[in-house]
Regions:
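PTP/DSP superfamily signal
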Residues: 2-8, 78-93, 108-182
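Glycine-rich nucleophile elbow surrounding the catalytic serine of serine-hydrolase chemistry
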Residues: 102-108
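Residue-level preference for the first positions of well-ordered beta-strands
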Residues: 19, 93-95
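Beta-strand elements of modular eukaryotic interaction domains
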Residues: 9-12, 30-33, 51, 84-86, ...
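Glycine-rich, flexible N-terminal cofactor/catalytic loop recognition
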Residues: 11-50
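Short polar/charged helix/loop
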Residues: 27-28, 46-54, 58-90
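Intrinsically disordered, low-complexity PEST-like regions enriched in Ser/Thr and acidic residues
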Residues: 1-11, 59-62
């Protein structure tokens, strides 16, 4: 189905041949961007980088969304998914990053896989988690992804369920049973 490249906490993680995921530190490291042959950067943090992109990066898109369950990340699913696809069709590579490379950027990579790779949300999560094991979109982004999957596929592979910590995606249900509420 896919090949992935885990890169640890600080590197670029290859989701597909044309889509990479990282944290802000890696996204601002010119040597990593050059090595990864990144041509487009999607920055999903509240602040725009003050560093100019290195040679080879032709496009820089800033989407100032906070990592809050009420942030409207869904408003950007199609824009980012289509940009990744368009860049891939031109032979380029897109890096999607947020501060930690865990929630916002992971959710956008999952949205791309849903829309352009035809996988379910459950499969998209597994795919991205294989590439970057620490991914965990916040619950609000999960709700938005679930709605997006319903819009694209007419059914859902993940659902929100009640837990001692509030509503969570069912894929975290077993994990949540072992946690104590604060």
């Amino acid at each position: 189905m896919h090949q992935s490249g885990p890169a640890g906490l600080s590197g670029l993680c290859r989701v597909t041949d044309h889509l990479y995921l990282s944290n802000g530190r890696a996204a601002n490291d010119p040597s990593q961007l050059t090595r990864g042959q990144i041509t487009c950067i999607v920055n999903v943090t509240e602040t725009k980088s003050s560093c100019p992109p290195p040679p080879g990066v032709e496009e820089y898109i800033h989407i100032p969304v906070s990592d809050s369950p009420v942030s409207p990340l869904r408003d950007h699913f199609d824009q980012v998914a289509d940009k990744v696809q368009h860049t891939a069709e031109r032979g380029g590579r897109t890096l999607v990053h947020c501060n930690a490379g865990v929630s916002r950027s992971a959710a956008l990579c999952m949205a791309y896989l849903l829309k352009h790779r035809g996988v379910t949300l459950l499969e998209a999560h597994g795919w991205v988690k294989t590439c970057r094991p620490m991914v965990r979109p916040n619950n609000g982004f999960w709700e938005q992804l679930i709605g997006y999957e319903m819009e694209l596929r007419g059914c859902n592979s993940v659902r929100m369920v009640p837990s001692s910590m509030g509503q969570i995606p069912d894929i975290y249900e077993e994990e949540a049973k072992n946690m104590m509420p604060l």
